[in-house]
Amino acid sequence: MIPQKLRLKNFLSYQQLALNFSGLHVACICGANGAGKSSLLEAITWAVWGASRAGSEDDVIHMGAKEAQVDFTFIAGSEVYRVIRTRSRNSSTSLEFQVQSEGKFKSLTERKVRSTQQTIVSHLKMDYETFVNSAYLRQGRAD
């Protein structure tokens, strides 16, 4: 998985953020403690797999906001994918999954979030457990 773009809206410590990784071979995320470095990786994990270190689903929503959204574009294999996950406070989660075709994104979204999640896993050939146990070391889990 090669990140291309990441947009956050009211996700954890971020109100608005847009990052463009296109053309980068290596990216270094650095900053002071509490600056939100881990939140960027949590955003990617939450967008793609719906999992985060937050205690409840609503805990990913920035304090005082009504909803959080992560829009993540990445390359996997020879395809460009886009995942948009939105969580509304005390309500529901929506999930969109798209693949780029002829310069435009085409929807691969299913009727239910669970079905769309299975489609994502099928395309990536990697579930959440495989990802966190092989490619991603979450904060506080370095034991």
Cite the ranges covered by each PLM segment.
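Extreme N-terminal "head/tail" segments of very large remodeling/mechanoenzyme assemblies
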Residues: M1-Q118, S122-N133
